[in-house]
Amino acid sequence: MTRIAIVDPQPAVRAGLAMLLRTEPGLVPVGAANDVHDGIELVERLRPDVVLLEHHLLDGDGLSLCRRLKAQPPAPRVILYTAEPDGALVLLARVASADGLVDKAAEPAELFEAIRVVARGGSALPPLEPHDLDAASHLIDPEDLALLAMLVDGTPPGDVADTLRLDRRKVGRRIERLLGRLRAGTAAAA
């Protein structure tokens, strides 16, 4: 059984996802939250295997929530489940250490498969296209290029810190700064 938590600001989406997940053998919705604060509490209390997470939340940013969830052992697997899965979000999802990204317009079978893949330890992130990196390159400080390259390749932040011989807290701050710049740049381009 794969235990799933849902974090989405829309009550109908939370309820609909829970009903949909109950129709699929082996997938069990265990709880839902509508914002960052409640999402953290829910995950700490229920310890789901997978979190379905909207990146636009009422009290903050789902990407930062993803990073927080992934930093606390035992870290759940996280799938960004969003209506805006563009190339910029693929890059942001990788930087935030998300395990998957699924469009809310996808067929249920695609969502179920993504959940199963990430629950087994795999990745359900779409490929990153070269133009996604090109569009973001002007937003990135030269000292963050190595950090970004490692994150995009799927290297966990702790391993990034060890490889770059940096303090883990400093790497965390640099990742948050990088996420902020990329979010601001992609919002300005929209």
Question: What function would you assign to each model-found segment?
Answer:
Residues D35-D38, D61-S64:
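Acidic catalytic/metal-coordinating carboxylates
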Residues D134-E176:
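Helix-turn-helix DNA-binding segment
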Residues E54-H56, T82:
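Active-site residues of response regulator receiver
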